[in-house]
């Protein structure tokens, strides 16, 4: 497309079907003369919630479903666990693919998705319920419980689990960084959410390796990811200029 042609015009090489962390590593890139490396893999690895029933055939992860929704048969009634943009994407996609009753369950009295994404989901016919936690998944649907908050939105108590009938449960509550590049690169560390830790300039604890977007912040909007990437790109230029001035 025109963006790809623009990149080639600028002298940028594109190497398709190449994974960093397999046959090639970050160390290999530095060995061959790269001065800085940007990691923008996104948060495209499902992260388990550690609840009973996640292995059942009627339980799916949002990141897997969104990659190829046509191979899934979710049924008429779908429960979507989570309140981020990926949860909205799952809900809207399920409606478009034929599911009739799609409900999004948020853990708090609010959402982490953008207001626009929520508006689109509601317009498409999705329902949203707030202050719901997930206890487990059964063949008949998820076991949820009510979460009670005070006026300052501090959690006060949680109710007993109850069944919400659903043909399928899609977990869109947690995603983490692809771990292959992390496992094979010293100095890249993750926080407890599985996201890459960076400083204010987007540099990881490995000098010269930078990162931004979903892999750092978690699933969010393209606008935010692009904004962060521009900031980090400028920091990478400064980093290289400073290193070259010392040599």
Where are these regions (language model features)?
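General small-molecule cofactor/ligand-binding pocket signal
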Residues: 13-17, 60, 127-129, 210
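A conserved FAD-binding loop/helix module that cradles the flavin
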Residues: 90, 212-243
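Cofactor-binding loop segments of dinucleotide-utilizing enzymes, especially the Rossmann-like FAD-
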Residues: 83, 106-109, 214
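Phosphate-coordination loops involved in phosphoryl transfer and adenosine-cofactor binding
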Residues: 17, 74-78, 131, 206
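Feature captures the FAD/FMN-dependent oxidoreductase FAD-binding
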Residues: 2-52, 135-142, 168-170, 175-181
């Amino acid at each position: 497309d025109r963006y790809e042609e623009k990149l080639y015009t600028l002298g940028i090489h594109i190497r398709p079907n190449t994974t960093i962390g397999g046959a090639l590593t970050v160390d290999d890139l530095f060995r061959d003369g790269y001065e800085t490396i940007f990691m923008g893999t996104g948060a495209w690895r499902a992260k388990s919630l550690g609840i009973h029933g996640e292995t059942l055939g009627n339980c799916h992860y949002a990141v897997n479903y969104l990659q190829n929704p046509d191979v899934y048969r979710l049924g008429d009634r779908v429960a979507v666990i989570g309140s981020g943009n990926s949860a909205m994407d799952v809900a809207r996609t399920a409606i478009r693919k034929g599911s009739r009753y799609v409900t999004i369950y948020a853990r708090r009295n609010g959402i982490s998705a953008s207001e626009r994404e929520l508006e689109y989901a509601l317009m498409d016919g999705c329902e949203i319920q707030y202050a719901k936690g997930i206890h487990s998944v059964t063949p008949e649907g998820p076991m949820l419980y009510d979460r009670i908050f005070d006026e300052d939105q501090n959690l006060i108590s949680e109710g007993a689990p109850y069944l919400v009938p659903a043909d399928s449960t899609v977990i869109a509550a947690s995603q983490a960084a692809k771990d292959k590049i992390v496992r094979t690169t010293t100095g890249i560390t993750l926080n407890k959410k599985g996201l890459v830790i960076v400083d204010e300039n987007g540099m990881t604890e490995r000098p010269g390796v930078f990162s931004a977007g979903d892999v750092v912040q978690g699933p969010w909007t393209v606008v935010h990811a692009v904004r962060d990437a521009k900031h980090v790109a400028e920091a990478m230029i400064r980093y290289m200029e400073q290193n070259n001035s010392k040599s």
